[in-house]
Swiss-Prot record:
The lineage of its organism: Bacteria, Bacillati, Bacillota, Bacilli, Lactobacillales. This is Sulfate adenylyltransferase. Belongs to the sulfate adenylyltransferase family. Keywords: ATP-binding, Nucleotide-binding, Nucleotidyltransferase, Transferase. GO terms for biological process: hydrogen sulfide biosynthetic process; sulfate assimilation.
Amino acid sequence: MQTVYGIKAHGGKLVNLEDFSEATRQAAEQLPSLTINNWNISDLELIGIGGFSPLTGFMVSDDYHSVVNTMHLKSGVIWSVPITLGVSQADADKIELNTKIALKGADGVIYGTMQVEDKFVPDKQLEAQNVYKTTDEAHPGVKRLYANGDVYLGGAIKLLHKPDHGAFSDYYMEPLETRKMFHDLGWKRIVGFQTRNPIHRAHEYIQKLALENVDGLFLNPLVGETKADDIPADVRMESYKTILKYYYPEDRVRLVIYPAAMRYAGPKEAILHAIVRKNYGCTDFIVGRDHAGVGDYYGTYEAQELITSVEDEMGMHFFKFDNSFYCKKCGSMATQKTCPHGAEDHISLSGTKVRKMLADGVVPPKEVSRPEVARVLIDGLKRKREQQQEV
């Protein structure tokens, strides 16, 4: 049994449901199988490695309804976003309760098994409204929810095969491993940072403000499915490595991927992101403006307000920062809390504007993005376009 270092896992125990034995794999090949998508595979992996502790499988009806309606599991543990396995009615009809099934990817690989304990039909309109705060199909998370299978299967899983993370493999670690790493580094307070975007000056500023108060920064970028106009994960990873190389102390930061899909659930997803980082061993977590948001579906500081209301229950400390910008008169990064000057002296660009500049090959102002980082992003996006044109 491996030692679990650091902060207590969410719900009290760090889950590990991995079984990579040949005997288990061979037994799984004899089971009835269900083909699941990449989103489901990433959820399966996070349940299996303990990132989603205390979950031990895809949610059964009692947990699902409790989470949708009360933001807590049936056990009373806070949990904000349903982790479900949706299937078609036709597939559901073929699967009997209390049977074990193999979970396959489109590649034919058996990634895990599941003991089917429950089959139920969710109220997707209610789930959308309570989790995403909208039933609008233009919302990417809601769109995916509606496109998902109409029947949910619930039950305990085993992880038999981890997905190949390709170029990111050197930056992949499980919660047990990150906790040991923090222990070996002597870090007692670790602040986690979630991102699906490149790190620009505003992100750098709030990360370093937090880093002044803790032992180490756990930079944990999401590399699973995102929406089409987000910057691709492989391009972002190059930008992370570049900014860490030139602008961060090497002994105070660790870069590890978060192999999850992006739900764009705003405030509710901010809580999920914090739970996962707690399981990875973080004692602290940064909640920025419009955390996990998309479009205008959520208020600028709505995620911060929700997470403040559950801070004691979460058992973590949260860093919450105002919108930051570069002030020409101050000659530095600042927020409204620290800068007395007007908007005419502030340099700040939206993520959409910065993405367009980068796509057009334009280096944003150095007050917005580090030139080294911008160049890596421009080159990476250009390379992606060329690859797409070749196909």
